[in-house]
Amino acid sequence: HAVGGGLEIAMAADIRIARKNSGKVGLPEINLGVLAGTGGTARLTRLIGKAKALEMMVTGELMSFEDAHACNLINHIWEGSPEDFRRDILDWCSQFTLPNKAVKAVGNIKRSCQTGPEIPFEYHLALERELQAALFNSTDAKEGIAAYVEKRVANFTGN
């Protein structure tokens, strides 16, 4: 389950993955006479939209992982066994780390995506250009471009 504060913590993550048929999500704080005040109202609204977030929080109802996936609160539902879940997810996540991806590029993508919606569009474009310019000077960008031209898999080092 990811309920209350647990969901508030999960919503701070870049990607949320749940194991199929293993729980529910929700912010039932209304049933205690309070609100999800550790980023819950702000993050849920941004993730799933105002109307669905309001409905979820004012009813206090929990939703299945499948329903949470349908409204983009969960990115992926994993069908593996409970015993293999952690290992499978760590294996899956390795695609975003060295040597498979350039970590500076991953970081800059995250920065642009997280900051962009909070600033005017033209500033977002300027931020994107600034982040891209910094990446073009990296060893990893040179490796990635060379690997593409040479039709081979890049071996990123984090530089």
Can you annotate each of these PLM segments?
Residues 3-57, 88-92:
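CoA-thioester-processing core
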Residues 40-43, 52, 105-108, 128-131, ...:
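Hydrophobic alpha-helical segments typical of transmembrane helices
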Residues 5, 69-71:
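Helix-turn-helix DNA-binding module
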Residues 56-57, 109-113, 148:
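Short alpha-helical scaffolding segments that buttress acidic/His motifs in well-ordered protein cores
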Residues 15, 55, 59-61, 67, ...:
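Well-ordered beta-strand positions
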Residues 18-23, 65, 74-126, 139, ...:
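C-terminal long alpha-helix characteristic of the crotonase
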